[in-house]
């Protein structure tokens, strides 16, 4: 327990929390050619590689992912949710934060139904999460 005098001299410091989706915290100033701290909920990017990866033990699957070069010039790995997708190299995608627990290094999700990404076909429930229109 600190004394009053110690609190007057030093004060209390709040803990600094590290961002779970750091690439969304910066935008790029092309005039100055530098990154600027400017947090955003989503960000646009271009898919540079689309493929599958296998999850950590004890799970087994082929999870779809895309390597995305964001508009702030940072390259990240993003998960493609839902069954089936239409993404190819050079597709323009919108990403949000949110990790995939069994894929190491995947901290972002691609938003279905936005930009070049189509919604999931034939989806009846949880449609808003997968960008599917009402039939």
From Swiss-Prot:
One of its GO terms (cellular component) is small ribosomal subunit. Transmembrane segments: none annotated. One of its GO terms (molecular function) is structural constituent of ribosome. Residues 1-20 are annotated as: Disordered. Residues 9-18 have a biased composition (Basic residues). GO terms for biological process: translation. Pfam families: Ribosom_S12_S23. Belongs to the universal ribosomal protein uS12 family. Part of the 30S ribosomal subunit. Contacts proteins S8 and S17. May interact with IF1 in the 30S initiation complex. With S4 and S5 plays an important role in translational accuracy. HAMAP family: Ribosomal_uS12_B (MF_00403_B). This is Small ribosomal subunit protein uS12.
